Amino acid sequence: MNQEEKKKIIEQFRINEKDTGSAEVQVAILTARIRHLTEHLKAHPKDFHSRRGLMKMVGRRRKLLRYLRKSNPESYKSLIEKLNLRG
């Protein structure tokens, strides 16, 4: 993921003009990185170092989503729909 892609994600999911680190933005960025790394692992199935990094990212995203679900359920639901998560 390059800076341009990251900026687009931040602009799409930010809450206000100066927001770059809210839970919503962090989850969106992690989701993009997870999807990119998943494609990489399909091409390189024996890349175990990247697989471990993927597992860490998935765990971090899960924790952020759990926090968001507790603190702001409406935002959680809209984020899940926008990112097409949870089946």
From Swiss-Prot:
Q: Which SUPFAM superfamilies match?
A: S15/NS1 RNA-binding domain
Q: Which UniProt keywords apply?
A: Ribonucleoprotein, Ribosomal protein, RNA-binding, rRNA-binding
Electron transport recorded as keyword: no
GO terms for cellular component: cytosolic small ribosomal subunit
Source superkingdom? Bacteria
GO terms for molecular function, please? Answer: rRNA binding; structural constituent of ribosome
Q: How does it assemble?
A: Part of the 30S ribosomal subunit. Forms a bridge to the 50S subunit in the 70S ribosome, contacting the 23S rRNA.
Q: What role is this protein assigned? A: One of the primary rRNA binding proteins, it binds directly to 16S rRNA where it helps nucleate assembly of the platform of the 30S subunit by binding and bridging several RNA helices of the 16S rRNA. Forms an intersubunit bridge (bridge B4) with the 23S rRNA of the 50S subunit in the ribosome.
Please identify the protein, giving its name as recorded: Small ribosomal subunit protein uS15
Q: Which gene encodes it?
A: rpsO
